[in-house]
Amino acid sequence: MKKLLLTALCVLFLLVVMPLHGVAGGAVTLKMAMYQPANHAFVRYYTAMMPMVEKITGGKIKIKIYHSATLLRSTEMDVGINKGVADIGFSYPPMMSASIPFLGLTDLPGIWRDTKGFNDAFDNGLTELYEEAYYQAGLTNLKVIGLTNIGFWYPCANTKKEVRVPADMKGLKIKGMGRMHVKYVDACGGTGVNVPIAECYESIERGVIDGCTGFTSNFVSWKLMEPCKYFVDFAPGLGPMMLIVNKKSLERKVPKELREPLLEILTLLVKAHRGVMLADDAYNHDIVMPQHMKYYRPNAEERKAWIEAGRPLVEEWLSKTGALGKKAMEIVEKYNQR
């Protein structure tokens, strides 16, 4: 993956840098908002790539990263970038699903076959539908560049007992990493709760909550694997990170000659990151997390039970998203046939 990325960047260098040496004006600095902490694999990747962006554009564009929610929190990302608080940023779309139901699509349990189906769907129509959903909701300054993912999410790591099937969630108070996760915990028979992720470790350690859902990056970067003892090794779905840009910032700050090359570079980085993140996800899952938690891997029948528990959430989502949701689900099903 690293060789592929470097090769692609070299091609971009030949196609983009040489013409850009004739572009007049000084360097443009754009603000990129990320809510993940500095040690998160997501932040590390883009921090390493930004000097390449500057080099490829002949020093004409600099992108400064504001990580750890220093510029925008996760719940503020979409609206904040639309307002121009940041020029560029990574949104976790389901965070906005309460006000824009369509954005909850990626967190729906049981609809994704695998990472290929996920990526193929977004590369063949879903990305454009997300931009349409933003537009319909009044966030008209947002341009969607592309979508990467932060790996698989899991329904329960806890301190109390081994969980094998959804019914075993009964009696457990579980923090959900997002609105849909909370609803899925409820649908499985547990009690889904909202706790700020920065408070999650202490809440589990003190017994305020029994555990959490999460991505492998949550368990490792936030160390949530440490107070938890049991982990159900079934992934209902994948998590998205969407790169969005403020259109007005692009037009106002970036010279016309640089806009398309910049978008091409950012699109490439997003797609290349998919492989980088999944490698990190696999390392966390296979090597790091088992040192702290006892895994239970559901059998085929038990996996069906976990998928069935999420069916009502899929139906509810479809009922709230109308024609746009129907069109999106058709794309999902086309590229995720089992």
Q: What are the functions of these language-model segments?
A:
Residues V17-M18, L129, V270-A272:
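A short hydrophobic/aromatic micro-motif that marks alpha-helical segments and, especially, helix-coil
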Residues V23-F118, Y134-R338:
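N-terminal secretory/targeting leader peptides
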Residues L15-V16, R44, T127:
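Residues in and immediately flanking transmembrane alpha helices
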